[in-house]
Structures are given as C-alpha cells and as structure tokens.
Amino acid sequence: MKQNKKLILSSIVAALALFLMIIAGIMPIGTYAIPVLASLLYIVLVKEIGYGWAVMAYAVTSIMSLILCADKETAINFILFFGYYPILEMQLKKIKLLVLRIIVKLTIFNAAMIVIFYIATFVLMVPASAYTVFGLYIPWIILAVGNVVFIIYDLSLIHISEPTRH
C-alpha cells in the first residue's frame, strides 16, 4: 500500500476513534465501553498497514482525546490501557509460554488500572463515593471483577484479530 493510502487509513481510524471518545460523555456506560470500542479500530491498522501506523494513530487519538473529550476519565482509560492494548496484544502473542503470556497480560492490565484509579482519584478528583457501594469502599473488588472482564476482552481481541479458519 502506498504511503498516502496508509496515512489516509490511519487518519480515518484516528478520527473514528476520536469521534467515539467524544460521544462517550453523553452515554452512561461510555467511560469504559467506548474506549473498548475505539480500541478495536486499531486492529485494522496493525493488520493492514503495520504497528508503526497504529501507534501513530493511537498517539493522535490520545492527545486529541485529552483536549476534546468532556469526560477526562474516559480519555485516561483510553490513553493508559484500552488504546494501546490491542496493538500490544498482537505483539504479546509472540510469547510462546502460555502461562507467562497470561501473567504479562494481567500484570499490564492491573498496573494500568491501578494508575488509572489513582489519576481519577487524585488528579481528576473523582469522589470516594464513586467507589462506595452500601457504605463499602470497593476498589479491590472492582479490580477483581475487572480482571474477569479483561480476560473476556482479551479473548475477544484474540478471536477478532486472528484470521477465520474454515
């Protein structure tokens, strides 16, 4: 594919991802669901034109999300995990030992979620009540449930990014 077509495709993906990120502010589940949807677009870039272009589109979407998204927590979720993970996941497939690959993926996810939690709490000033249910402060429970959801997300990415076998 010619360079100008690669630029056009990566620009379209970045624009679509940014559009999704911007509309996340008007959807109740947008903080988590929209970054996941936006992240799926980067699989196309990796498959069609390569990692470099996907990383460039991710960087553009990340910067523009910080500037244009009303919901900064959504932008942070995208920047610190969901935006780059599909690109990275395709590289993590190269780790042959399944147990090691799973440990690496879960470590990346948990580290990102902990950083996102602290940024949301101390920089974006998300109140502690957002992490409280029936008087219980539950960030660790949320993280545990998040690990289960992450495994489903990761398995979905694997199946989406692999060619269909007949």
Residue map of PLM features:
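Short helix-perturbing small/polar motifs within transmembrane alpha-helices
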Residues: 79-114
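Alpha-helical transmembrane segments of multipass membrane proteins
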Residues: 17-21, 65, 85, 109-117, ...
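Membrane-interface helix termini and inter-helical loops of multi-pass transporters
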Residues: 123-136
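Central hydrophobic cores of alpha-helical transmembrane segments
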Residues: 54-64, 101-110
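Interfacial aromatic-anchored transmembrane helix boundaries in multi-pass membrane proteins
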Residues: 22-31, 62-91
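Residue-level detector of conserved catalytic or cofactor/ligand-binding positions
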Residues: 156-166
